[in-house]
Amino acid sequence: MANIAGQYKLDKSENFDQFLDKLGVGFLVKTAAKTVKPTLEVAVDGDTYIFRSLSTFKNTEIKFKLGEEFEEDRADGKRVKTVIVKDGDNKFVQTQYGDKEVKVVREFKGDEVEVTASVDGVTSVRPYKRA
C-alpha cells in the first residue's frame, strides 16, 4: 500500500449541503460546515489508523483498527457505533450505525483522497489534495 500518511486539503464539495440536510444537521452547524475548507490529517501507527479533520470551525479525530467497532460523534451530534474496513489497497469504508446508517468511503489516489459520504440515498463527494 502506498504511504497515505500526511495532510490533505479540501479541494471542493459536491452535494454536501443535501447530505447534511438528510443527516439532520442543524442550520448553524450546517452553515459553518459548508463554509470551511478542512484539512484531513492521516497518521498510521502500526495497525492503528488516525484520521483527523482540522478546521477553524471544528476539529475531530477517529482512532481505529480495521474491523474493530468503536464509538464516535457523528456530524449531527449523535453518538454512533462505527466500523472501518479496507476494500483493496487504497480504500477505507466506514459504516456508522445509529438511527441512520451512514457510509463514508475514503479512496486514496496518489496525492489525492476522495471522500464519498452517503445517507438515505443522498451522496456527497469531497476530493482533497495533498498539502
Curated annotation (Swiss-Prot):
Domain of life: Eukaryota
Compartments in which it is found: Cytoplasm
Gene3D superfamilies xref list: 2.40.128.20
Signal recorded as keyword: no
Single GO term (MF): lipid binding
Residues given in the record as (5Z,8Z,11Z,14Z)-eicosatetraenoate binding sites: R106, R126, P127, Y128
Record Pfam families: Lipocalin (PF00061)
Keyword flag Transport: yes
Residues the entry annotates as binding (9Z)-octadecenoate: R106, R126, P127, Y128
Residues in coiled coil: none
GO cellular component term, pick one: cytoplasm
Keyword entries, A-Z: Allergen, Cytoplasm, Lipid-binding, Transport
Protein family membership: Belongs to the calycin superfamily. Fatty-acid binding protein (FABP) family.
Function: FABPs are thought to play a role in the intracellular transport of long-chain fatty acids and their acyl-CoA esters.
Domain notes: Forms a beta-barrel structure that accommodates hydrophobic ligands in its interior.
Protein's recorded name: Fatty acid-binding protein
Organism: Lepidoglyphus destructor
